[in-house]
Swiss-Prot record:
<keyword id="KW-0813">Transport</keyword>
<comment type="function">
    <text>Core subunit of the mitochondrial membrane respiratory chain NADH dehydrogenase (Complex I) that is believed to belong to the minimal assembly required for catalysis. Complex I functions in the transfer of electrons from NADH to the respiratory chain. The immediate electron acceptor for the enzyme is believed to be ubiquinone.</text>
</comment>
<feature type="transmembrane region" description="Helical">
    <location>
        <begin position="324"/>
        <end position="344"/>
    </location>
</feature>
<feature type="transmembrane region" description="Helical">
    <location>
        <begin position="177"/>
        <end position="197"/>
    </location>
</feature>
<dbReference type="InterPro" id="IPR010933">
    <property type="entry name" value="NADH_DH_su2_C"/>
</dbReference>
<keyword id="KW-0830">Ubiquinone</keyword>
<dbReference type="GO" id="GO:0006120">
    <property type="term" value="P:mitochondrial electron transport, NADH to ubiquinone"/>
</dbReference>
<protein>
    <recommendedName>
        <fullName>NADH-ubiquinone oxidoreductase chain 2</fullName>
        <ecNumber>7.1.1.2</ecNumber>
    </recommendedName>
</protein>
<feature type="transmembrane region" description="Helical">
    <location>
        <begin position="201"/>
        <end position="221"/>
    </location>
</feature>
<keyword id="KW-0999">Mitochondrion inner membrane</keyword>
<dbReference type="InterPro" id="IPR003917">
    <property type="entry name" value="NADH_UbQ_OxRdtase_chain2"/>
</dbReference>
<dbReference type="InterPro" id="IPR050175">
    <property type="entry name" value="Complex_I_Subunit_2"/>
</dbReference>
<feature type="transmembrane region" description="Helical">
    <location>
        <begin position="150"/>
        <end position="170"/>
    </location>
</feature>
<feature type="transmembrane region" description="Helical">
    <location>
        <begin position="1"/>
        <end position="21"/>
    </location>
</feature>
<feature type="transmembrane region" description="Helical">
    <location>
        <begin position="24"/>
        <end position="44"/>
    </location>
</feature>
<keyword id="KW-0520">NAD</keyword>
<feature type="transmembrane region" description="Helical">
    <location>
        <begin position="273"/>
        <end position="293"/>
    </location>
</feature>
Amino acid sequence: MNPLALTIFLLSLAIGTTITLSSFHWLLAWIGLEINTLAIIPLMTKTPHPRAIEAATKYFLTQAAASALVLFSSLISAWQTGEWSINSLMDLPMNILSIALMMKLGLAPLHFWIPEVLQGISLPTGLILSTWQKIAPMALLLQTSHLINLNLTIALGLTSIMVGGWGGIGQTQLRKIMAFSSIGHLGWIIVILKFDPQLSLLNFVLYIIMTAAMFMSLTTISATKMLEISTSWSKTPALTTTTMLILLSLAGLPPLTGFTPKLLITLELVKQNATLLAVMVMFISLLALFFYIRLTYVVTLTLSPNTPNSLLTWRTASRSYSTTAIMNTMALILLPITPTLLLL
């Protein structure tokens, strides 16, 4: 792709998200979401492959339907209250808006587009889709968290955690595994949204850090299938080791970063007398833990047959991977500074 065109599309992504984050008017928020949607489609079709075209089409249709629902809910709200303010929503438009934003995020049972879209695009575009594209809808959900229906968030959150774990078990494609991982993590974020929006925000930030680190590692290794990542040990042992630890962090095992949100959410649910919900969330999450540990086993504990000559790979001038190293570090060792993060 032309570097100038790429710069314009990336700037459009940044501008769209910024407009949505800084808006108090529903029309401006909707415009920001639309700019975001339209800016990423050329990035998806950067490689003219039928799978990429199919992924971009599915993404556009889903996001267009969700944007129509956002506009519909804001029109109903303006008709009922006479205001276009984001915080002046009645029950019906709030429920419609919640469903629309959760469709944009890819929460179950509105998750049908995420695995197929991620499978059809490149890893760098998948990184943008899994992290940056979720900021604007999540910001709108956080702004309206005091109005959102508690039963709706709990139902969709539990469904997402279950679908995220169940769907990832039989997968061998790493992008689909990351798609179901994203669905599961967003389920955790939505479950706690009504109880403690600040904790949802912390969980979302940590989700972005861990997901970005995983996508950057996969991009560096150039792995899109489980077979490819299982043979990467002989080429990049250090990066493969950190990739294994990031997988365990995504699974939520202590003492890694991913344990932080799960611990805090469980404690908050118990504090809010929702102990049964906390137990259900933890038990359902064991499904996701299974496929994370399975992938970890494939990455580190299985070595493909290779001769000593295969270890001597041709080495060109090495590129700097400082950003990947920084993200990997943050995805692993943020647990000790959690009290500091909570005070920010």
